């Protein structure tokens, strides 16, 4: 056979081998390829193909050059290893040709290049984009004077890059060892080939080290240079130190640890030089000097730090740490967005009257006597109707109802396919038939039926509304339980909702889904792992597959870099249903900011409001915080993903809420960081905690509550979220934190501080007074012994005018069977009074007296037909007005008596008691006249 024929034969072998490799590669990655195609179609259907392609383009821009360069470098490195091996053993005699060996080395170089490029492109693509597009925070840290964005977006990439380089170095060490082991096994040097200075012996590892000394030396130099870079970046970790009295760099960190890091940088650079020296001297033992010197610097630094902390800082801690406490205070408040809280004094008094109650009837009408937990139970028992329908959660929102601004409970009725009967668990039912949930349950928070259940404004099948809110598109194709893919526009009609003896059916009229025509039907059959899709006669060219319908999955697939709230809530707008979800930008790299979140995170912003159409599945991202540099960086990377909040339809914008998750974090931080004075903060002289309450029969921290409230100085009620504070070891109320939700005031935080010279009851004190009230406690015990359990609802703190009203509903549930909880009583507390009545109105009447209009009506009925009735009515009305004035005067005199008692002014105290006696006598005479 001629040389040309041999060459041709070898080429054919190479081509065949390459073809086999490509086939195996494609077959092995077929699933990934199909997922890539179908995911692209999914993004395209939503209008976010640019988001999908940004990731792909960036990975290719990183991966392809890195693959080419990496493969070449790996190949040259392997060739260098081979040559070095034969050079060391002074032999170039080989069993196979030099050319053949070089060809064989192409394959591992290709594999290593592919591994490295795919790993780096897959893990670093987003970090690189963040680094390249980072927007400034316009705030610098106090130690190194870097913009905060450097720590939030740039430093994480640099650290990740060093980790990647370190991993590649370890891979190079492994490659070197494995290569020389293989070479040693297939080409062990003969007696005449061994160099005299190698001292070749039976100790394989010593021999290996002698041969690979050059490569290990080169890798060692790079390693110590990388280590120096790691120590350089590690300096910035001092901003997150936990050594001092607060989070962040302390006195010891800035005066000792910082210099230890710098010494370790120098030691690492000297170690790199030492590796070169060890190689030149051919003495591997000299390599031990490098790690020993670095470790010694670290140990010495720790000893010095310990000494400085114990003998310089601790004896005079407040003076040494004062500047760092100030940094911690300032940067923690900035990181959690509590620096803009408006702090104001609450002009507290106990002079609330019946007239004030009537003037604030909008607030009274929105006091929540229903609790969302019992309401959820009720919805699932009386509005689910079928086992496969489920209300996952009850959300609190506000709507204009019949011209009034009302707070409501709202819950979507979703279809849970897992609850279909065993016989109904078929592919047709799960994919074509039972495709969507239906409608919502809507209730006012303050109204109950005669049986103590929530009044349902929106209910049943088909959806019925007793108010002026309508839902014309009640189907829910996208929700929290929609985990199964479905196919719409098929020959099989979809189940819509149950009727008495039949089922209503429908066909999908929306825009969601990828068409199942052409090759798509085969692609999605493969993706879903079923032949039924391919063989079903119900599927036509007009059919569409709808997958990834779960709203959480949907958001995470589009924008996984955003953290989403775990409590999506449903909104009605123009007859359609929409999901609204809060999105957060979170980081754990804000300098000096105390971590208060899971994962040691210490920065949070509610930067995104996500809206998902429950029928069509469209997903819209609206930027709600245009001052957050992280979301602005995301917007620079994905310009087609985000929209300004002004683009949100007004009907939806009216339902955005200040997120409870963010408010709870901020309220927890504010309990400590309301103290601005660093000395007060150091001594924790004014430390607060979120108030305690008794829920059910257990004591717990009060849950922040959405409610309607008329804030001091405002003319109308608004939707807010609030939480009360008490001193850390006391139970009297110290402050009330409120976040506004409506209109231009959205996002404003106000802290109302209670006067320190008055005892303002905290929720726990009210709970204790309820327990101490003989009448109430006896009734609670009686109900609890009669085969029922008593559930004490959330205690609500309701500001009205300059006073505080406390309201707590009581629920009764039979301990046997599947009985529903019902509102049994409402407890109301004001000042020193506590009453329990079947309704809120009756409880208020007991405290403040009945409405004048109601009394007039009763009197009019009693005197109807009497010729003097009008005169009698006028006299009684005048008497009621006089009694009201006397009650107000008695309250004022009583307050004066208490103030005199606190000041030890017993003369004024006695005068006040005498005046109080006169007022009470006049009141008694007036009431006797009314009774007659």
UniProtKB/Swiss-Prot annotation:
What Pfam families does the annotation carry?
UPF0182
* Protein location: Cell membrane
Chief subcellular location equals: membrane
Transmembrane segment boundaries: 14-34, 60-80, 104-124, 166-186, 208-228, 256-276, 286-306
Kindly state one GO CC term assigned in the UniProt record: plasma membrane
Per UniProt, the keywords (alphabetical) are: Cell membrane, Membrane, Transmembrane, Transmembrane helix
Membrane topology recorded in Swiss-Prot or TrEMBL: Multi-pass membrane protein
InterPro entries xref list: UPF0182
Q: Which HAMAP family match?
A: UPF0182 (MF_01600)
Which family does the UniProt entry place this protein in?
A: Belongs to the UPF0182 family.
This chain belongs to the protein called UPF0182 protein Amet_0022
Q: Which organism is it from?
A: Alkaliphilus metalliredigens (strain QYMF)
């Amino acid at each position: 056979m001629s040389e040309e024929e041999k060459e041709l034969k070898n080429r054919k072998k190479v081509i065949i081998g390459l073809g086999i490799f490509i086939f195996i590669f494609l077959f092995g990655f077929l699933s990934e390829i199909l997922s890539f195609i179908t995911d692209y179609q999914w993004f395209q259907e939503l209008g976010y193909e640019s988001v999908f392609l940004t990731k792909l383009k960036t990975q290719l821009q990183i991966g392809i050059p890195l693959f080419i360069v990496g493969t070449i470098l790996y190949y040259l490195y392997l060739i260098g290893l081979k040559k070095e091996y034969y050079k060391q053993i002074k032999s170039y005699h080989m069993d196979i040709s030099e050319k053949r060996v070089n060809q064989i080395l192409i394959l591992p170089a290709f594999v290593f290049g592919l591994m490295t490029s795919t790993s780096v492109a897959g893990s670093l693509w987003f970090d690189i984009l963040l680094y390249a597009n980072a927007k400034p925070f316009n705030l610098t840290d106090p130690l190194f004077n870097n913009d905060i964005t450097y720590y939030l977006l740039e430093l994480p990439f640099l650290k990740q890059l060093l980790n990647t380089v370190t991993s590649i170095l370890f891979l190079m060490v492994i490659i070197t060892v494995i290569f020389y082991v293989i070479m040693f096994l297939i080409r062990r040097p003969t007696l005449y080939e061994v160099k005299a200075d190698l001292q070749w012996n039976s100790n394989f590892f010593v021999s290996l080290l002698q041969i690979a000394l050059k490569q290990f030396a080169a890798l060692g130099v790079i390693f110590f240079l990388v280590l120096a870079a790691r120590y350089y970046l590690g300096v910035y970790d001092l901003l997150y130190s936990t050594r001092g009295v607060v989070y962040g760099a302390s006195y010891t960190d800035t005066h000792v640890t910082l210099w230890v890091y710098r010494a370790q940088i120098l030691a690492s650079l000297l170690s790199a030089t030492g590796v070169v020296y060890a190689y030149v001297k051919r003495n591997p033992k000299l390599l031990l000097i490098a790690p020993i010197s670095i470790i010694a610097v670290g140990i010495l630094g720790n000893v010095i730090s310990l000494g400085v902390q114990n003998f310089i800082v601790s004896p005079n801690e407040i003076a040494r740490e004062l500047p760092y406490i100030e940094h911690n205070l300032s940067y923690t408040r900035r990181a959690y967005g509590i620096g803009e809280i408006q702090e104001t004094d609450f002009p507290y008094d106990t002079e609330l009257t019946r007239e004030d109650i009537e003037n604030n009837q909008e607030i009274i009408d929105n006091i929540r006597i229903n609790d969302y937990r019992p309401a959820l139970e009720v919805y699932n028992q009386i509005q689910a109707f079928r086992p496969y329908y489920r209300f996952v959660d009850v959300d609190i929102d506000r709507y204009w109802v019949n011209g009034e601004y009302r707070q409501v409970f709202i819950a979507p009725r979703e279809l849970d396919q897992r609850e279909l009967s065993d016989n109904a668990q078929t592919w047709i039912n799960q994919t074509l038939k039972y495709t969507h949930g239906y409608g919502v349950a809507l209730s006012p928070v303050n109204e109950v039926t005669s049986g103590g259940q929530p009044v349902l404004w929106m209910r049943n099948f088909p959806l019925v509304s007793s108010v002026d809110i309508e839902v014309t598109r009640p189907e829910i194709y996208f929700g929290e339980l929609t985990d199964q893919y479905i196919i719409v526009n098929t020959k099989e009609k979809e189940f819509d909702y149950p009727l008495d003896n039949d089922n209503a059916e429908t066909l999908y009229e929306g825009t969601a889904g990828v068409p199942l025509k052409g090759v798509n039907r085969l692609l999605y059959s493969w993706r879903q792992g079923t032949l039924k899709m391919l063989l079903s006669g119900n599927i036509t060219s007009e059919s569409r597959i709808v997958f990834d319908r779960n709203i959480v999955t949907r958001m995470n697939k589009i924008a996984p870099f955003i953290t989403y709230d775990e409590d999506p809530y449903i909104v009605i707008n123009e007859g359609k249903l929409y999901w609204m979800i809060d999105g957060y930008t979170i980081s754990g790299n804000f300098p000096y900011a105390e971590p208060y979140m899971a994962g040691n995170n210490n920065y949070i912003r509610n930067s995104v409001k996500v809206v998902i159409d429950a029928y069509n599945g469209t997903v819209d991202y609206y930027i709600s915080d245009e001052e957050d540099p992280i979301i602005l960086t995301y917007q620079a990377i994905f310009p087609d993903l985000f929209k300004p909040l002004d683009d949100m339809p007004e009907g939806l914008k009216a339902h955005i809420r200040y997120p409870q998750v963010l408010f709870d974090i901020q309220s927890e931080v504010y309990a400590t960081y309301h103290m601005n004075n660093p000395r007060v903060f150091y001594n924790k002289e004014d430390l607060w905690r979120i108030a305690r309450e008794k829920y059910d029969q257990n004591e717990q921290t009060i849950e922040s509550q959405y409610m309607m409230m008329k804030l001091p100085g405002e003319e109308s009620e608004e939707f807010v979220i609030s939480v009360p504070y008490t001193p850390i070891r006391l139970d009297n109320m110290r402050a009330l934190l409120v976040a506004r939700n409506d209109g231009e005031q959205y996002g404003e935080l106000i802290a109302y501080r209670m006067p320190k010279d008055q005892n303002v009851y905290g929720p726990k004190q009210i709970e204790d007074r309820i327990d101490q009230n003989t009448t109430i406690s006896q009734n609670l015990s009686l109900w609890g012994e009669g085969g029922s359990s008593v559930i004490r609802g959330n205690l609500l703190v309701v500001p009205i005018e300059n006073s505080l009203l406390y309201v707590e509903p009581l629920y009764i549930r039979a301990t046997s069977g599947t009985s529903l909880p019902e509102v049994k009583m409402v407890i109301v507390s004001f000042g020193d009074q506590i009453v329990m009545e079947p309704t809120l109105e009756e409880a208020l009447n007991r405290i403040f007296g009945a409405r004048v209009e109601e009394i007039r009506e009763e009197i009019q009925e009693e005197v109807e037909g009497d010729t003097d009735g009008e005169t009698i009515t006028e006299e009684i009305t005048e008497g009621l007005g006089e009694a009201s004035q006397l009650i107000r005067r008695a309250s004022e005199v009583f307050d004066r008596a208490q103030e005199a008692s606190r000041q030890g002014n017993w003369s004024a105290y006695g005068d006040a008691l005498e005046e109080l006696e006169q007022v009470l006598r006049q009141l008694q005479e007036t009431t006797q006249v009314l009774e007659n």
